[in-house]
Amino acid sequence: MSAEKEIVIGVLAHQGAFEEHQECIEKGTGCKTIQVRTPKQLENIDGIIFPGGESTAMGLIGSVGGMWTALKDFTQSGKPTWGTCAGMILLAERCVGGSAVIENGQSLIGGLDILVCRNYFGSQISSFEMATPCPPGHEEGGDYPGVFIRAPAILNVGVDVEVLGKVVATPCRQAAVVLRELEIKIARGENVVMMGVV
């Protein structure tokens, strides 16, 4: 009889809320976590979390030492991958909004077939909380508080992406301009579907 293998979850620790993610995973699941800063550390984990933080800073730090390529390879390997806020931006296949992405050509790791809009809900001072519906099959817990701090929004999902929850909220002025650009693309006949945000 063999002992069960210990599950080890890596948390990208270049910048952002990596310690908070570690604490939540360890308390909530009992799984071991490690902070991931180098490509070598990816060899010893069963899944990875890309935490919230500042996606531009994460991208700049990750571009050193082959880390970005190693992260892309890891996410494409099929191992479990989770992105929170800035982490979701990095995992998106496409991103709009925010000068850091448009002007500086911030690279994305990709792997998640979504189009995101950075800072959809505005600046730090525009942050807010609202009730967020639980995913299908988990409604017995009721709504939970969604926290939107300079939060991105998912504007489009690929056909293989399962949407677990939706929030209807008003974008900030900058995001409204991005949405207008998408409306123009739709008018031209380009295939753009906006789901989950109004």
Task: Please state what every model-predicted region is.
Residues 34, 50, 101-104, 108, ...:
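Short, functionally important structural connectors and interaction interfaces within domains
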Residues 7, 31, 79, 106-107, ...:
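A structural micro-motif
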Residues 55-136:
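Cysteine-nucleophile active-site neighborhood
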Residues 1-2, 118-198:
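Amide-donor transfer/coupling interface in amidating biosynthetic enzymes
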Residues 9, 15, 51-52, 82, ...:
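Short glycine-rich loop/turn motifs that provide flexible caps or phosphate-binding loops at active sites
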Residues 1-77, 183-191:
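N-terminal beta1-alpha1 cap of cysteine-dependent amidohydrolase-like domains
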